[in-house]
């Protein structure tokens, strides 16, 4: 994989020169960060997150280089990646056989090929970013630097095929068949199915619904369906203000988990923005979040300040506090009901 990354980097200067006359475009993103967790984890790994995952350590949250192909009837994206969020996200990637597992999968953020079947219908296949939720893996594209709990505990990526239908410029619908809940390698003989519908009601208001259904148990365990549904509303009352609310609910084997987030972003002036988030997440039976202690029933709030220092350079700082009904957050060698994070990031896009 290292040889593959070096090969891509070697062609970047040439590719950049022809980008303006070619359907192939090269771009990239580097997100550096420093995070302070008041729990001061002894192994430096922060709990219950993949973003800014290391305490008191300068590191790379996500760095990727991408090749994008855009033609009238063919499209594709190849993105190679590294960073602590990558290490965290692929830690649970199953290893089944000799050519699977996190060490093989984690450096591919996306490797997807798309072909237009009709004027309004596309077929895409490969490793792709998830169709779930309202937040991106790439922090630059989110109103807050850190992701909400509902985004952290829903799939970041998936491997499969999808059909995307855009009957009008205001409605987009897709159906997808994937290997499972955030896994490239298979865990059983079944596939999961998902769907999403996005509808732009007006220039200021858009809504979306998404779902995923499948058996996530290994072959040697009894089959049990996981059902997941979510919805999001994005309201942009002005060029300077955006409000996004998202809610998810899932169930498996008689247990239910749910969560929600309300995010607001205000552009104070060009180059300066403020963002705030309230969130809630309840996984009483620890279906997705194993605490090793009490149930994960947590609420939280965050406040962020974003500065654009130069074209393509963004400095983001966020403070986030989480509070649980039970003591679940590591606090040195004990557990606490609260967790406080201060993180600052310097990112480059090109």
Predicted regions and their residues:
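Residues on the lipid-exposed face of transmembrane beta-strands in outer-membrane beta-barrel proteins
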Residues: 28, 56, 60-69, 110-115, ...
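Outer-envelope exported proteins of Gram-negative bacteria
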Residues: 25-29, 77-83, 124-126, 176, ...
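Short N-terminal segments immediately surrounding and downstream of signal-peptide cleavage
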Residues: 21-36
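Outer-membrane beta-barrel pore domains
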Residues: 49-52, 86-89, 96-104, 136, ...
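Outer-membrane beta-barrel channels and translocator barrels
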Residues: 21, 70-74, 118-120, 130, ...
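Cleavable N-terminal export/targeting peptides
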Residues: 1-22
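Surface-exposed coil loops of outer-membrane beta-barrel proteins
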Residues: 33-58, 86-110, 117-202, 208-215, ...
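Glycine- and aromatic-enriched membrane insertion/assembly motifs of diderm outer-membrane
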Residues: 52-85
């Amino acid at each position: 994989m290292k040889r593959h990354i070096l090969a891509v980097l070697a062609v970047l200067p040439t590719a950049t020169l022809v980008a303006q006359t070619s359907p192939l475009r090269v771009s990239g993103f580097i997100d550096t960060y420093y995070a302070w967790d008041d729990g001061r984890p002894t192994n430096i790994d922060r709990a219950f997150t993949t973003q800014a995952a290391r305490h008191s350590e300068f590191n790379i949250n996500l760095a990727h280089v991408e090749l994008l192909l855009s033609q009238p009837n063919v499209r594709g994206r190849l993105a190679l990646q590294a960073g602590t969020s990558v290490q965290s996200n692929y830690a649970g990637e199953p290893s089944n056989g000799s050519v699977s597992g996190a060490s093989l999968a984690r450096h591919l953020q996306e490797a997807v090929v798309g072909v237009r079947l009709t004027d309004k219908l596309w077929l895409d296949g490969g490793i792709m970013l998830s169709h779930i939720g309202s937040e991106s893996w790439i922090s630059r594209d989110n109103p807050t630097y850190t992701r909400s709990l509902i985004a952290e505990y829903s799939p970041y990526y998936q491997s499969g095929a999808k059909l995307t239908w855009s009957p009008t410029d205001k409605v987009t619908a897709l159906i997808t068949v994937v290997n499972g809940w955030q896994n490239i390698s298979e865990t059983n003989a079944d596939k999961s199915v998902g769907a999403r519908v996005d509808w732009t009601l007006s220039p200021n208001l858009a809504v979306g619904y998404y779902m995923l259904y499948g058996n996530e148990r290994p072959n040697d365990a009894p089959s049990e369906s996981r059902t997941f549904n979510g919805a999001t509303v994005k309201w942009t009352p002005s060029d300077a203000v955006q409000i996004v609310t998202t809610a998810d609910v899932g169930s498996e084997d008689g247990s239910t988990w749910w969560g929600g987030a309300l995010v607001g972003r205000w552009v104070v002036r060009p180059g300066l923005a403020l963002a705030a988030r309230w969130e809630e997440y309840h996984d009483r039976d620890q279906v997705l979040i194993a605490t090793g202690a009490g149930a994960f029933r947590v609420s939280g709030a965050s406040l962020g300040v974003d500065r654009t220092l130069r074209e393509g350079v963004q400095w983001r700082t966020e403070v986030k506090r989480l509070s649980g009904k039970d003591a679940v957050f590591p606090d040195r060698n004990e557990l606490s009901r609260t967790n406080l994070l201060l993180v600052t990031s310097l990112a480059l896009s090109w």
